């Protein structure tokens, strides 16, 4: 942490002197060092504090490079908020580790998880069916499928029916559940394995037809993170293969969304106009979110005291339709087309620097207990909880995950699957003849 604070101070001074490239590189180096520190201690590739350190601090370093004309020197309050966001998380995690230690139960024994095979398989069927049926209803009611629409710019933005669309995008959980199923089942039933592969294909087809790059990446990343959480490692060749397969799909969806190179370069306003799009697009999807936070800090007239962060409550209960004023707050961004923001945007919107610090401390506390939990997990669906939080921390530079109703819907759906699998597995653990009969009646 001392090294980080030194690097942070150096980056701040370099930014004030206008030496942007060095300001960014210092923070990127600090992010790598922080990740390596936790990885060497734990051997966990997706250790939650390590992941957050690498991507939050590293993302800030990328933003400090100031490669776009949309970038500007940050205010002192912005620098304080970014420091509080990381310092609160890291400090609370460190405090809890010193008070309680990071041990958390016995190592995983695969034979203990075999009783979860059948409920896991049925969970995949239910979610896949719900997603496909919901997609079909939306397509029928709205009268179009985004992939096949040419004369409707940004068709993906209009392809949703309130409430129902949550079930449509729930398909992103299926690949991760199939990873759990494959590792638990261990190839004992080839027909079910083939069926699981078909369900994976269907669950990936939905975001492709919706031309949603985000949902596609989310589905694949959750599956990869779940595999790493369960196996503790992954071969580099597998990761390279996944990336190679994802690139053409990403390009296809970008074209289908009507985002050609000329359009994107016009929005990004890069200082070097000849910079290739495969560099400028990921750069802007990281860097501009920090710039948007700075816009919020400099332009926000007053705080909203929790209303922004409670948006999932207003959305999932339908209150936003009854009281529109609950969600009628402007978005402060560098450009209207670039609306993605960091994880801490709404925390500052609600309570300023204090909100950012409290929120980061809470995330650090939750992450500590999740890391402890994953070491002694007995229900394999617990790995999906861990993977979701790991992914949200990895993409902490990208959006306000916990102010997003879809995030809570995914967590609730995962909780439902957890309980379903827990109840479905109990018959093999000696919970009595009546419960075994109940299980047989439900699962066959």
Region locations from a protein language model:
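Hydrophobic, aromatic-rich transmembrane alpha-helices
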Residues: 30-39, 173-186, 358-373
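Small-residue-enriched transmembrane helix-hairpin modules in multi-pass membrane proteins
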Residues: 151-161, 249-366
């Amino acid at each position: 942490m001392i090294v980080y604070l030194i690097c942070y101070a150096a980056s701040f001074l370099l930014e004030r002197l206008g030496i942007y490239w060095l300001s960014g590189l210092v923070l990127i180096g600090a992010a790598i060092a922080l990740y390596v520190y936790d990885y060497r201690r734990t051997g966990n590739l997706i250790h939650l504090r390590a992941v957050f350190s690498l991507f939050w601090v590293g993302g800030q370093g990328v933003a400090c490079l100031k490669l776009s004309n949309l970038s500007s020197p940050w205010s002192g309050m912005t620098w304080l908020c970014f420091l509080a966001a990381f310092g609160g998380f890291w400090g609370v995690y460190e405090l809890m580790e010193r008070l309680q230690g990071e041990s958390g139960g016995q190592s995983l024994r695969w034979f203990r998880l075999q009783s979860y095979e059948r409920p896991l398989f049925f969970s995949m069927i239910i979610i896949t069916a719900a997603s496909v049926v919901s997609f079909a209803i939306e397509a029928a009611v709205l009268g179009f499928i985004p992939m096949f629409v040419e004369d409707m710019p940004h068709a993906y933005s209009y392809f949703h029916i309130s409430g129902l669309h949550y079930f449509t995008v729930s398909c992103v959980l299926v690949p991760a559940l199939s990873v759990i199923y494959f590792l638990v089942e261990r190839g004992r039933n080839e027909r079910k394995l083939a069926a699981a592969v078909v369900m994976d294909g269907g669950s990936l087809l939905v975001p492709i037809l919706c031309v949603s790059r985000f949902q596609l990446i989310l589905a694949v990343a959750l599956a990869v993170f779940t595999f790493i959480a369960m196996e503790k490692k992954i071969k580099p060749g597998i990761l390279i293969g996944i990336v190679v397969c994802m690139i053409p799909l990403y390009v296809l969806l970008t074209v289908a969304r009507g985002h050609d190179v000329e359009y994107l370069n016009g929005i990004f306003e890069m200082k070097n106009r000849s910079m290739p799009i495969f560099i400028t697009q990921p750069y802007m999807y990281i860097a501009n979110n920090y710039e948007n936070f700075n816009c919020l800090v400099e332009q926000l007239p007053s705080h909203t005291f929790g209303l922004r962060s409670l948006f999932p409550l207003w959305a999932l209960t339908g209150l936003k339709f009854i009281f529109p004023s609950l969600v009628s707050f402007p978005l402060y961004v560098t450009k209207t087309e670039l609306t993605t923001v960091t994880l801490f945007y709404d925390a500052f919107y609600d309570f300023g620097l204090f909100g950012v610090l409290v929120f980061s401390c809470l995330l650090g506390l939750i992450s500590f207990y999740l890391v402890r939990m994953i070491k002694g997990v007995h229900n394999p669906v617990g790995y999906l909880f861990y993977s979701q939080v790991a992914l949200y921390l990895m993409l902490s530079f990208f959006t306000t995950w916990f102010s997003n109703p879809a995030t809570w819907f995914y967590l609730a759906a995962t909780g439902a699957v957890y309980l379903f699998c827990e109840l479905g597995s109990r018959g093999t653990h000696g919970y009595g003849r009546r419960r075994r009969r109940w299980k047989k009646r439900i699962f066959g």
